[in-house]
Swiss-Prot record:
The lineage of its organism: Bacteria, Pseudomonadati, Pseudomonadota, Alphaproteobacteria, Hyphomicrobiales. One of its GO terms (molecular function) is ABC-type vitamin B12 transporter activity. PROSITE patterns: GATASE_COBBQ. Keywords: Cobalamin biosynthesis, Glutamine amidotransferase. It comes from the Bacteria. HAMAP family: CobQ. Transmembrane segments: none annotated. This is Cobyric acid synthase.
Length: 484
């Protein structure tokens, strides 16, 4: 019989995704058939699953941790926030429409059947399913029709382990408060809790564990330290762009403007891991640094809206000066579209604005269309003559004179565009920096040595390290019951 456990947080960004990945790798290392599952995710960081649909990148990473192919059923409902049209709803890997907040609340009960179907598919043949909640079950204003947290747990009869983040402070209050606010039927689902992101002497929290026990009766299944290896994993939430230091004083500065609807920003993680690269996330109100050698414009879930905001920040003028100084620019997906001369949206897919002038750094135009390209791809860099792998998730078609200088071929067809002087390029291929040979060639063209590290191997070894740390700190009796 398949066992299941669900990790829910006392709030957002408490570390659930990493813990689920760590538990999946721990179970896989013990020889179990383990699968990750998240009923509902909200993220513009999407991946293309092995069966050809869209899922959250966290679930893609968790499938890697479990050493199993990724599937659309591991994340049956994915919400991708857009601009004034609310969120795009991805159901079992395919676009199912758009919905604003209240519309989605009304839609949720209708999605439960698909969620349970996917859970059944993921569970089939598995020894263990590790489920991840979303946000917090204490948001009782969203409890009616819930499919992300306790609504799913009660319907599927999956026991819950709460995760509290001690690093942000107030973890005792968050756990006790969650106990106080949950209705009795939800409270009964909680088997215990984990403390996450602890720094220092764990014994100093002994009295805290006792206090939580007095108020709630819940057992503590472990105090998890700050997992340093997690810094080598792809980040899921854009909140990390505000927190992570990405080096300073290095040989090459790479600037990344943080678009308001930034998507798939983990494209930058392999560059951040390079010893001689300083990755600078440029937030609204800041200028693009004058000493950057490369500017990367990342993906966007709302190209027209982000293009308007790009100009409002004055980044268009900064970028023009950067190119005049001899700097390089790479646009990925939505960032590629932004670099062109025009973006048209005749059907209003992104919103009410039908057309906008682009930055004009590439002689190309983009027209949005309802058909969405979603696929994993093998590619070849025509610029550097090396192979690479990645994926495509985009709407629209881009054409123009600079497409004659396509920087890559994807599955044998030309993709992207390059300016005549070679300083500006764009492509629809996500994940290109994760290919070690391409990254090394790119960095060499920018005057530094790099790309020697195997990025994918680094991610895999980080998962093993996290699993080993969890095995050392989690309650042994609970872990043995869970893993059998």
């Amino acid at each position: 019989m398949t066992r299941a456990i669900m990790l829910q947080g006392t709030g957002s960004d408490v570390g659930k995704s990493v813990l689920v990945a760590g538990l999946c790798r721990l179970a896989a290392n013990r020889g179990l058939k383990v699968r990750p599952f998240k009923p509902q995710n909200m993220s513009n960081n999407a991946a293309v699953s092995d069966d050809g649909g869209e899922i959250g990148r966290a679930q893609w990473l968790q499938s890697l941790a479990a050493r199993v192919p990724s599937s659309v059923h591991m994340n049956p409902v994915l919400l991708k926030p857009q601009s004034d049209v609310g969120s795009q709803v991805i159901l079992q890997g395919k676009v199912a429409g758009q919905a604003k907040g209240r519309e989605y609340q009304a839609l949720k009960p209708k999605l439960l059947g698909a969620v349970m179907e996917s859970f059944g598919r993921v569970s089939a043949g598995a020894d263990l399913v590790v489920v991840e909640g979303a946000g917090s079950p204490a948001e009782i204003n969203l409890r009616a029709g819930d499919i992300a947290n306790m609504g799913f747990a009660t319907h599927a009869n999956v026991p819950v382990v709460l995760v509290g983040d001690i690093d942000r402070g107030g973890v005792i209050a968050s756990l006790v408060g969650t106990h106080a606010i949950l209705p009795e039927e939800d409270r009964r689902m909680v088997a215990g809790y984990l403390i996450n992101k602890f720094r220092g002497d764990v014994s100093l929290f002994d009295d805290g564990i006792a206090a939580v026990g007095r108020f709630t009766g819940w057992p503590c299944f472990g105090v998890v330290p700050w997992l340093k290896s997690a810094a080598r994993l792809p980040a899921e939430d854009s909140v990390v762009l505000e927190k992570l230091a990405r080096g300073s004083g290095k040989a090459l500065k790479v600037a990344v403007p943080v678009l308001s609807r930034i998507a798939n920003f983990d494209d930058l993680d392999p560059l951040a891991a390079e010893p001689e690269v300083e990755l600078v996330f440029v937030r609204p109100g800041m200028s693009l640094p004058q000493d950057a050698g490369l500017v990367v414009i990342p993906g966007s879930k709302s190209t027209i809206s982000d293009l308007k905001n790009f100009r409002a920040q004055g980044w268009d003028r900064d970028l023009e000066r950067h190119v005049r100084r001899g700097g390089r620019v790479i646009g990925i997906c939505g960032g590629y579209q932004i670099l062109g001369t025009r973006v048209a949206d005749p059907l209003g897919i992104e919103g009410s604005e039908r057309e906008i002038a682009g930055l004009g750094l590439l002689s190309v135009e983009t027209e949005m269309a309802p058909e969405k390209t979603v696929r994993n791809s093998r590619a070849w860099s025509l610029e550097h003559d090396v192979g690479l792998e990645g994926y495509e998730i985009h709407l629209g078609k881009t054409t123009g004179a600079d497409c004659e200088r396509a920087p890559v071929t994807i599955d044998g067809r030309p993709d992207g565009a390059m300016s005549a002087d070679g300083r500006v390029m764009g492509t629809y291929l996500h994940g290109l920096f994760g290919s070690d040979a391409y990254r090394a060639a790119l960095l060499k063209s920018l005057g530094i040595e790099g790309g020697g590290a195997n990025y994918r191997q680094s991610v895999d070894s980080a998962l093993d390290e996290i699993a080993a740390e969890l095995e050392g700190v989690l309650d042994g009796a609970w872990l043995n019951r869970l893993l059998g």
